[in-house]
Amino acid sequence: MLMDHPNWLKQRAELTPDRMAVIQGDHKLTFIQLFHEAKKTAGRLKSFGLKNGDTAALLLTNRMEMVIAVHACFLLGVRIVLLNTKLSMAERSYQIEHSEAKLLLTEKPFIEEHRGGQPARAVDIEDVQNAACPPVTEIESIHLDDAATIMYTSGTTGRPKGVMQTFANHYFSAVSSALNLGLQEHDRWLIALPLFHISGLSALFKSVIYGMTVVLHQRFDAEEVLRSIKDQQVTIASVVQTMLSRLAAKVDRCPGSLRCLLLGGGPAPLSLLEECKRKRLPVVQSYGMTETCSQIATLAPEYSIEKLGSAGKPLFASSIKIEKNGTECQPGEHGEITVKGPTVMKGYLKNEAANKDSFNDGWFKTGDIGYFDDDGFLYVLDRRSDLIISGGENIYPAEVEAVLLSHPNVAEAGVKGVDDKTWGKVPHAYLVADSPVDEEELSEFCKERLASYKVPKAFHFVDRLPRNASNKLMRHKL
């Protein structure tokens, strides 16, 4: 049984009350101010029926109110489901219902879609902020093995799975990151990634654990981010490939304060890493996923040039193996990446079958392919064999194929990622049609059922799809 910790935000507010916690534009909160705002919001949420042990779903963009709401839920002892704002209403509703969320905390324009209270009562964050503020007693301690957050990630079967991330996962992720990247007194971490993704949300946990300032952007804009790095003296920023590419195109030389651009969301092409090297942009590659509560391997800064293209070595207290057919691979031999350690999720919510398939003697099978070099550095070859990573968003072909196959005129469907200069990869669909159907109709059909980034950017009509002897679709031959 893991030990308990004092309430993190309350403890941080007592230790460094006047240190800046969050900056978003002109809106700034110190840790003591953040604690007071979170406690007031906790009281308001309690008046809306939330209590210790409940689950709340958050459907919010990057805004100060979301930061406050996250901490308010933790003060109440409420676990959080982070909903992707890009999902369709049907996708969001499934996640709300499956997680048994009691309350949906959201904003315009989403509030109108969920007004009916199905499957949870929807409340506008502005209504919460304007509500009366009854007194509330925050929980004094947190149980490290309790689930703090739930994030849904689609599996290769196309069905969403709820990843349960414990307070221990978040704590050891933050500590392991600090042991790898170092922690400096004046560190400021810029986040322009969505807070509903683990790479964005993890910065909020690091903030209270480190006593570090988060500089929050509602969305990514290269010029605004570069201006913010200069004006706010940002030292670390989390990025994905598309963001890094746009930043590199805008600068000739690295801003003086910046010591780390933590790159996640899939491998970056060597050409981009070499461009960043020329411009002295301090790119630190990492490897991780929702199930590992952000990074589980990171390339230490001193190896960033020598091991260009590597995701580095496991973070402290974590382990990584490469396996093939149940046998550990030798250096240079390709196999499945398996991971173990205190940042690995508690499991998938209400999905024992997936848990059984994903874990073997405590090791989590990622489904990703990679290898170690002779020096023990990890190289990731593919983020799961068929996974499409588009602008940092995960797209699972099976999920898109299932929607296409639900169209009455589509007999067979296959989806794969095609290289794209802007997004890295975009989905293309390959179809066998029962009767005539045009691309515009299919696109509209998908838009009603999928997030916009999952909708195929092109539709190719073929006579048959490539399949193996077992009749399994061979997507790499599409």
UniProtKB/Swiss-Prot annotation:
Q: Which SUPFAM superfamilies match?
A: Acetyl-CoA synthetase-like (SSF56801)
State if Nucleotide-binding is listed as a keyword: yes
For this chain, the family text in UniProt reads: Belongs to the ATP-dependent AMP-binding enzyme family. MenE subfamily.
Q: Name one Pfam family in it.
A: AMP-binding_C
| Entry GO MF terms | ATP binding; o-succinylbenzoate-CoA ligase activity
The family database entries (InterPro entries) matched by this protein are listed as:
AMP-bd_C, AMP-bd_C_sf, AMP-binding_CS, AMP-dep_synth/lig_dom, ANL_N_sf, ATP-dep_AMP-bd_enzyme, MenE
This protein's record includes keyword ATP-binding: yes
Q: Which gene encodes it?
A: menE
Question: Which protein is depicted?
Answer: 2-succinylbenzoate--CoA ligase
Q: Which organism is it from?
A: Bacillus licheniformis (strain ATCC 14580 / DSM 13 / JCM 2505 / CCUG 7422 / NBRC 12200 / NCIMB 9375 / NCTC 10341 / NRRL NRS-1264 / Gibson 46)
